[in-house]
Amino acid sequence: MKQKFKRAILYARQHRANQEVNESLHRLVDFLSTQDIEIFQDSDTAASFELKAPVLPREKMGAKHDLIIVVGGDGSLLSASRMAIKVNTPVIGINRGRLGFLTDILPQDIESHLGPVLNGQYNEEERFLLHTKIYDKENSYFEGDALNDVVLGRGSETHLIEFDVYINQQLVSHYRSDGMILSTPTGSTAYALSAGGPIMHPQLNAIVLVPMFSHSLSSRPLVIDGEAEIELYISKSNETDLRISCDGHESRVVKPGQKVAVKKNGNRLRLLHPLDYHYYDTLRSKLGWESKHQG
């Protein structure tokens, strides 16, 4: 039997404030009230929803028996992950989004699937995040974390951008493209997949670099060691500013001549699943793959 939980922190993003999310949050409160669980909400949740639960400041999260319950889609869980790794608190998701690669529990299954989890019946896996720094000469002026991907892209202009990629201080290539996606295995079924990247099992210790519309027929996705340190040097020949984004949320300007450094974050996300969760079932369901022919 694994760890049982005594406190639940409900998390929902402000811009996901719709009736469906609201219904699931209230259903959670009603259910958790019957399970001898202390119920709290995050400050983001309290800003958009009226729940009968006190706000737990983030600096007070991280007790041994805490569990963060995310209501929303994968984007909501991505946002919660950056909070969760700082307090080493496990996360589980109620899917109120579209695909739901990370949010396992369907709204109608809250009681039947979450109940066993609260009592220690679950699978736990660790997912790593990428930590990004932007440097102006020797000083960094931005740091961000991404569970899915870090994306270097064009600003407001529509022409190709130029940059050099180094791995462990060794030059890989000079690129002329629309940008570059640096993805974790978790993010390999997200934006990187749309750009032609491979699907990687989430327990792989690897990072994939996926060029976006490269001006070279030989430019292909590159899978590298997860411990590698990646540097993107922005060419001074770029006539406009570029942008770096972490999981599509945190976005910052990168100027010609600057450097972006990306490596694995030392903290891991503790992601929980119900006992009947299977990764390949999720892939088959979410991506519309065929099941075994019956007949």
From Swiss-Prot:
Look up keyword Nucleotide-binding and say if it applies: yes
What this protein needs as a cofactor is: a divalent metal cation
Q: Which GO terms describe its molecular function?
A: ATP binding; metal ion binding; NAD binding; NAD+ kinase activity
EC number from the UniProt entry? 2.7.1.23
Provide the active-site residues from the annotation: 74 (proton acceptor)
* Catalytic activity line of the entry: NAD(+) + ATP = ADP + NADP(+) + H(+)
PANTHER family attached here? NAD KINASE
> Any idea what this protein is called?
NAD kinase
What organism is recorded for this protein? Legionella pneumophila subsp. pneumophila (strain Philadelphia 1 / ATCC 33152 / DSM 7513)
Q: What is the lineage of its organism?
A: Bacteria, Pseudomonadati, Pseudomonadota, Gammaproteobacteria, Legionellales
What gene is this protein translated from? nadK
